[in-house]
Amino acid sequence: MTVEKQLGMRIRYLRSQKKWSQEDLALEADINKNYISDLERGNRNPTLRVLERIAVALNITLEELLKGIDSF
């Protein structure tokens, strides 16, 4: 499985733990909803800045966001 797919699954899991929609996460992280959708499907390779914004929105560390992803 690619890193992008693993990351997308992780973001989807963490988002669902908060019972947030993709739109909720997009608003909290100030990221386009379509971009969140692409990320969760493994179709994007996000920058560190985007990952940081997602982590802050989810109230977790970047390390927690990347936990369990093979290449990290």
Regions found by a protein language model. Give the residues of each.
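Short, conserved catalytic or interaction motifs in soluble domains
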Residues: 41, 60, 71
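DNA major-groove recognition helix of helix-turn-helix/homeodomain DNA-binding modules
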Residues: 49-64
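Recognition helix of helix-turn-helix/homeodomain-like DNA-binding domains
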Residues: 31-44
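Short, charged recognition helix plus adjacent turn
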Residues: 64-72
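Conserved hydrophobic/aromatic packing and binding residues within compact polymer-binding modules
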Residues: 11, 25-26, 36-39, 65
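A detector for short, charged/polar N-terminal pre-domain segments
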Residues: 1-6
